[in-house]
């Protein structure tokens, strides 16, 4: 199905099932511990051996010798896999560094060997016996140190210029010129990376924890140099990903290599301390913002430049993209700079680009509003735009940022905010309020599904879509139930298997909208088959209560399947609407914080997000996504930071003891409001995505609230005690 014109009225608009707050249908399995994750398919792969990864102890250089003799002789050891005995390997298109290193070492904890043994404990013990010898090369590990050497944009991401920024900024009546930094961050998903591989002749089955089944399958086949049709990926349940499981990782490749070598199933799991350095992370940024406005507060010039680092062949953190679209202004400049760093691979993490970019932009907007003497909510409203500032002929499909901000201000009680910093106290606590706009583009990906109508009236949905804790099972079931007129309880959903039609996968906030659109397309085809089976015109037929009705005639779905199960497979492809219209999602984030006047401790007291993100397919699962994202934004604002050893080139705090993330007690009150934002230009579902929007802008809202509470403007995240203590107002 080609979606190339705005959606008219369609079966989803009935909203009998879609748009309602249903519980997650996979919830009972997860809460009872019976949902099986990648490491838990014991019956399907009996007699599994275990692999333990040996990671490089240097960040850059060469492996001069690798002595595995002692490990191979250790109790229970079956094999030691290295680059020298693994056979010729390719490299996946989406991997920056090789997943099995040697002799060249590209980053710290790059896998250089896998010890395979009868038990996990034996493999771990034997791994400690592997002796690696290196020649260390000088590496670059500090973005600040490398910044000056990078003054040109990457070849494939040139600077964007509109109008005359330099002239407009010079003549601006009010201006801000400041630099902001965000640190390296880790995904820290609850489930570690884990895989289990089984070979049957030349056919590989891999159970793994991966967000994008087709990407994983394609890159694994390419790396192993086997036909892609010989690889099957299974990943029905994933314990969080946040972008860290978008791509093929070392656990999957090494499990496959080991299983082939020892001719039996092999399990490989990355221990928590290995994950930050062995896999990927959100790269640090250094962002320079210059914004100018006229006397009335209207922005006349905006420039956003961002520096980030990555391994050779890597890509920059696209932290400027929201600045191209969020506010009006005739004169604009954005640019990305990429330094070569020898830290572990930088790659996607929840809301790549916009999340760190808004951490800077939305502080700068507050600073400019203060200089202009305008309330920060009103300043954002004043500078709203309904068109792409770089192309005024290109409108937004839907844009309700003003409504998000006004609704949020009213609900939050913004009028009671004291605009003068440091004036509101609650005992020993300084109290402040902050706001930020949220923005995330609406990305669209082709997505397919297969839908069966069984003779007993039940419906089965099959797609390689994944559920990373987001509610995919539920919204796909809701879609099929709505389309075919059956109760939600009569729909079974099977996900995460490469033998199913290729879906959009879980990432980029596109999963819900595009995967349900794929199911919509398959159901439309199935509706035609059902109508044909009973002799009805499909375009004039309605589906409800297990029946198909055409005028005064009706038939049961059971009658339609008298000849056997009906099956339809279809995919949704998106045309040029995304080029004709700018498609984005918006939010208004409001935060109240308390800052202890003696210790500098920051406590988030309450948070509110008002979101405009297309049709909300399931308010309950969507709210869960947003409050989780808000929590992640709080972590980014106040605590999350991968500490870099800039002598040896690795992340020091590489576990959950050293890398702090928020817990329930850190945020006592969160509220989410969804505006009616049905968008027929987005998809036949008229939805968008919300899981990343809930993060975008939160950290800046907290930073702005801290400023309102204390008068201290922190531009370097996270906002830790040391950045507040010596500047706090005197204790009264």
From Swiss-Prot:
Active site: 692
Subcellular location: Periplasm
SMART domains for this protein: Ald_Xan_dh_C
GO biological process per UniProt: catabolic process; cellular detoxification of aldehyde; DNA damage response
Major localization listed first in the record, in broad terms: periplasm
Enzyme class, broadest EC rank: oxidoreductase
Protein name, per record: Aldehyde oxidoreductase molybdenum-binding subunit PaoC
Species classification: Bacteria, Pseudomonadati, Pseudomonadota, Gammaproteobacteria, Enterobacterales
